[in-house]
């Protein structure tokens, strides 16, 4: 479904099963794996006796320290504009492109940042808030496309 929606409706494309099931690139499995990765980090955080709150999570996020953290925050800030444009133009591929760019921004942040091993509690809480916000945004976006994320892959 994601593979179909990620292509501009007015353009021809070749159905390629290998591309649609790949865990790399702008594909459904890549997006879903990113969401599952975030859920896994949050579950590990909870296992250490910490609580993840959904409400007001944005208030815990500190100003960005690194390049990838800032890039993730900037990508999150584009949400309203992308959703409005996607619906106004009946262009689900634009929402898919945003989802892919957000997943890429998260994965860069994940590779650059030791989220769970951060020693400063306020910084760690900020990271947890940021990835909680990212997970929620990704799940809302795929939900708009009629897709649900699994708990595990």
Please report, for each region that a protein language model flagged, where it lies by residue.
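Non-catalytic interaction-recognition regions
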Residues: 1-153
């Amino acid at each position: 479904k994601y593979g179909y929606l990620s292509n501009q409706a007015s353009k021809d494309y070749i159905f390629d099963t290998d591309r649609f099931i790949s865990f790399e690139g702008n594909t459904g499995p890549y997006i879903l794996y990113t969401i599952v990765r975030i859920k896994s980090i949050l579950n590990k955080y909870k296992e250490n006796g910490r609580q993840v709150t959904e409400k007001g999570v944005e208030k815990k996020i500190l100003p960005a320290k690194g390049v990838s953290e800032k890039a993730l925050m900037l990508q999150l800030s584009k949400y309203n504009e992308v959703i409005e444009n996607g619906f106004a133009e009946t262009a689900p591929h634009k929402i898919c492109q945003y989802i892919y760019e957000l997943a890429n921004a998260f994965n860069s942040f994940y590779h650059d940042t030791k989220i769970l091993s951060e020693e400063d509690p306020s910084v760690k809480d900020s990271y947890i808030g940021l990835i909680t916000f990212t997970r929620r945004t990704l799940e809302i976006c795929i939900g708009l496309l009629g897709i649900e994320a699994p708990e595990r892959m």
